[in-house]
Amino acid sequence: MNLLKIALFTAGLTLISGCATTHDARILGADNQVESRSMQTRSFDTSDKNIVIRNVISTLQDLSFVIDKADTDLGTVSATRLYNGNKVRMTVTARSSSTNKSTIVRANAQYNLKPIDNPKIYQDFFSSLSKSLFLSANAVE
């Protein structure tokens, strides 16, 4: 009888562990981390992170985003907009480079909580940001 109980217990554990979820490599985004980082990141030739953050805010507003949070100390800006009735969220971080001669900006966009991996979206954002920084540096408002 004890052998039957042990066999049933072992079979039960096997069935339960078979229902457990497995870790998917996509959860950590291991597929294309380097590719994603390269399309989401640009370096700008200014050491003033606050100017970059102000221009990030202006650029997002120019692109019809509503600023949800902005923290110049941390160098983060979060914004949302509606596109075809769905929510697009963009989070942008700015940090000084290791040499303190440039500022590195990384943008992360989501469409309905799914990451946007279309390079054109990021190219358009960084192009607008670059123009804004140029105009700001040359005192054109």
Task: Provide a role label for each language-model segment.
Residues 1-8:
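Bacterial N-terminal signal peptides that target proteins for export
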Residues 15-18:
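C-terminal motif of bacterial Sec signal peptides marking the signal peptidase cleavage site
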Residues 20-141:
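Ser/Thr-rich, low-complexity intrinsically disordered terminal regions
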